[in-house]
Amino acid sequence: MSLNFLEFEQPIAELEAKIDSLTAVSRQGEKLDINLDEEVQRLREKSLELTRKIFSDLGAWQIAQLARHPRRPYTLDYIQHIFTDFEELAGDRAYADDKAIVGGLARIDGRPVMVIGHQKGRETKEKIRRNFGMPAPEGYRKALRLMEMAERFKLPIITFIDTPGAYPGVGAEERGQSEAIARNLREMSRLSVPVICTVIGEGGSGGALAIGVGDKVNMLQYSTYSVISPEGCASILWKSAEKAPLAAEAMGITAPRLKELELVDTVISEPLGGAHRDYEAISTSLKAQLLIDLAELDHLTSEELVNRRYQRLMQYGYC
């Protein structure tokens, strides 16, 4: 898999390119008895050391870039690695099936659950089909339909958040985008079953919140959660998107900062270099946290779940 190095990772990319070149030469030179294994190993150790150094001191803007990484695992990747027996459910039973939201029945360690999440695309056609992970009202209404189904059958709900925001097109507004988001916020706060939400990439504004009201809210180490994108904030405050790095630092969009503010419960560590470097490792860590959360919430009655969720929402903004 191509790692698609970001701008701040270019020193690592240069080392990796040298490693690839030497490895190719070594393979071709086997017939000539040329052995470059020691040099390749030295460069690999240097690359690892450099990666550790760079990732030990990332700024908010660099983390925002990682949250948007084109190879970052999406909802369907986690469904494939964490769950079994996934059966996708489609449509909002009112207008259409929005491909920017996926969801359905699945099992985690044999336990039935309802899984719902934003889904971006990787290739151009898939990105367009998924609308770049920006749901329309029918996407949020589909999500709510699945949540209400889960409540009827007493199934825990697990959501994965990864969107730049709700789709702002004219058609979406005409079909009631703000109403769909507001309804989800209200209804999720009343659900009588456990709800566990995890930000796996971008957590963009109301588009993220519409499936983000939970008993437990987790964030991956290099994910972000904010009311507006850094570029959008910079355009408003400084009239220039070039100030996005400054805006990202000021907005407090990173997982550690949001945990300090008690807006999220757990920050899940990612593999060195980010989740895109090792799908298996990040899926294992995420699954372990989901199982911990489920076990904790299992001890609560439906009334306790709703009351705790209400108190959680009411204390936002007070630290």
Swiss-Prot record:
UniProt-listed Enzyme Commission number(s)? 2.1.3.15
PROSITE patterns in alphabetical order: COA_CT_CTER (PS50989)
- A Pfam family that the UniProt record links to this protein: ACCA
Which keywords does this chain's UniProt record carry? ATP-binding, Cytoplasm, Fatty acid biosynthesis, Fatty acid metabolism, Lipid biosynthesis, Lipid metabolism, Nucleotide-binding, Transferase
The Gene Ontology biological process terms listed for this entry are: fatty acid biosynthetic process; malonyl-CoA biosynthetic process
Q: Which reaction does it catalyse?
A: N(6)-carboxybiotinyl-L-lysyl-[protein] + acetyl-CoA = N(6)-biotinyl-L-lysyl-[protein] + malonyl-CoA
Please give one Gene Ontology molecular function term for this protein: acetyl-CoA carboxylase activity
**Where in the cell?**
Cytoplasm
Q: In which pathway does it act?
A: Lipid metabolism; malonyl-CoA biosynthesis; malonyl-CoA from acetyl-CoA: step 1/1
Cellular component aspect of the GO annotation: acetyl-CoA carboxylase complex
Among InterPro entries, the record links this protein to: Acetyl_CoA_COase_a_su (IPR001095), ClpP/crotonase-like_dom_sf (IPR029045), COA_CT_C (IPR011763)
Q: Does the keyword Iron apply?
A: no
Boundaries of every CoA carboxyltransferase C-terminal domain copy: 35-296
User: Family per UniProt?
Assistant: Belongs to the AccA family.
* Chain's role: Component of the acetyl coenzyme A carboxylase (ACC) complex. First, biotin carboxylase catalyzes the carboxylation of biotin on its carrier protein (BCCP) and then the CO(2) group is transferred by the carboxyltransferase to acetyl-CoA to form malonyl-CoA.
Describe the protein's quaternary organization and the partners it interacts with: Acetyl-CoA carboxylase is a heterohexamer composed of biotin carboxyl carrier protein (AccB), biotin carboxylase (AccC) and two subunits each of ACCase subunit alpha (AccA) and ACCase subunit beta (AccD).
What is the protein named? Acetyl-coenzyme A carboxylase carboxyl transferase subunit alpha
